[in-house]
């Protein structure tokens, strides 16, 4: 290979790498495999409208959208868990789960483990229900907006700093 061929090969690698097409093609192929396996083009799939797409359209803010996405990702993880013994589609599910893991949980294995723990908590278990109710106050406090308090303190410090400099 001469110098020009190396440069052309390098440029091709850069173009394919930056476009994202090269990386996403296997992902889309795996979704197509699952669509074929589940016969997702069957007319009854359209009955009742989409499962998730309309809901996703209703949520515009990034933080709100993350909440909905977590529930949707949870659904897919449960679906894949129920089908884990199916050898025909195992590879496709593994590739898609890995991609979801990278996109939704930023590749953090700790977040993935916590997410899996939450998914697997049985809601029909009395002991679990008791624990959940026992922790409810702390969970509600954790959900309350702390950022407003921080913003207020920051503003107060800025105002006090301006007064002191005058």
Swiss-Prot record:
Gene3D superfamilies: 1.20.1250.10. Coiled coil: none annotated. It is found in: Secreted. Its main location: secreted. Released primarily from activated T lymphocytes. Pfam families: IFN-gamma (PF00714). PANTHER family: INTERFERON GAMMA (PTHR11419:SF0). This is Interferon gamma. It comes from Lama glama (Llama). The lineage of its organism: Eukaryota, Metazoa, Chordata, Craniata, Vertebrata.
